[in-house]
Amino acid sequence: MTMNLITGKAGAPHITSSDQGAMQAGLVGNGNYLLQGGDGKFPAVTMQSANKALVPVLNLVIEGRYARVTAAETVTIESGVTGRNRNDLICVKYTRDSNNIETIALAVLKGTATSDTAADPTVPSGSILNNSGTVWIPIARIPISGITAGTPVMLVKQLPPMSQLWDSVTLYQDSNWIIMRNGRM
């Protein structure tokens, strides 16, 4: 059957993570997004030491898949080299096996050391929405200058809650005029 009523009762298991992910991607967007925390702030990766980055509790939507770091997790960054610069990427590594079992884990893509300006390492291509078996989603860059790891730079887009977006779509009506706000006022 090529058509399914996903939110209807079918009498047999028929809802997949792909179904839910496709719906969420349609509502939120096909990209990768960081959701606001319960404290109203967007969490950020920090450095604990020269070789340890701390990924805090956070919520992500990754190509329609909802993912959570439920307890802060430490990621190891390899030491830099004196006189060389490097960028490493902290990523969410998504895998889907031959039985369609999906898993995620934090992983580091190590950059190449250079005496010039560091560039991000190449992120292997892949898409959850296109059924790739492995997908790397960069969430933060760790700039390394010599043996010193710099301040992490968050790479994933921030997605504010819907309650903060209402004013951007609210109509204003006065007499015979209807005004729709588009952009900043």
Positions of PLM-derived features:
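N-terminal "first-domain core" detector
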Residues: 1-60
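Detector for methionine-enriched segments
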Residues: 1-3, 23, 47, 154, ...
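Beta-strand-rich solenoidal segments
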Residues: 5-8, 53-174
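Intrinsically disordered, low-complexity, compositionally biased regions/tails
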Residues: 12-15, 25, 30, 41-44, ...
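Surface-exposed ligand/attachment interfaces on beta-rich extracellular proteins
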Residues: 13-17, 35-46, 74-86, 117, ...
